[in-house]
A protein has these predicted regions:
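Positively charged, small/polar-rich N-terminal and surface patches that mediate targeting and assembly
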Residues: 1-150
Length: 150
């Protein structure tokens, strides 16, 4: 079992930006559900919210083979946006679901990247990576075989 992350090479991100984007991609399968409030409860003391408790449910294989194992990750490079989106297409053809099995990571363009697209509020962003939840090795290989290691 391994986690696959594919990052764009054409953006020429600095090492720090690349690391940050890959970290976002690595954690998205955990942070996106929490950020949407799934399994989150407030912790109260004396009527005041002092924190939050988040429940994360992992399938048996993910826990036993990845969390309780080696946290194996493979980082590949995509030549450009179109090649990165090919990974999305391959994943969907394999039955994987966006925002559950894989996550498209977009930078908010506050530092070194220029926006490629804009959301409904006019906020600029650039697609940088695709991150997958931990996958069986054979599925990760089917997606990554079209890409080189970063």
């Amino acid at each position: 079992m391994r986690q696959l992350i594919i990052a764009r090479k054409d953006l020429q991100m600095s090492p720090g930006k690349l690391a940050a984007q890959c970290c976002h991609a690595s954690l998205a399968f955990l942070t996106d559900p929490i950020g949407m409030g799934q399994g989150v409860e407030p912790i109260e003391e004396d009527g005041e919210i002092t924190g939050y408790r988040a429940e994360i449910i992992l399938d048996k294989a993910t826990y036993e083979e990845w969390f309780d194992g080696s946290f194996t990750k493979t980082i590949c490079g995509a030549k450009n946006r179109n090649q990165l989106l090919k990974a999305k297409t391959i994943a969907e053809e394999l039955g994987l679901v966006e925002n559950n099995d894989f996550f498209l990571i977009r930078d908010a363009c506050h530092t070194e990247l220029e926006p490629e697209e804009f959301d409904e509020n006019g906020e600029g962003m650039t697609l940088t990576c695709i991150g997958f939840r931990p996958l069986p090795d054979e599925i990760a290989r089917q997606i990554s075989r079209k890409f080189h290691l970063y």
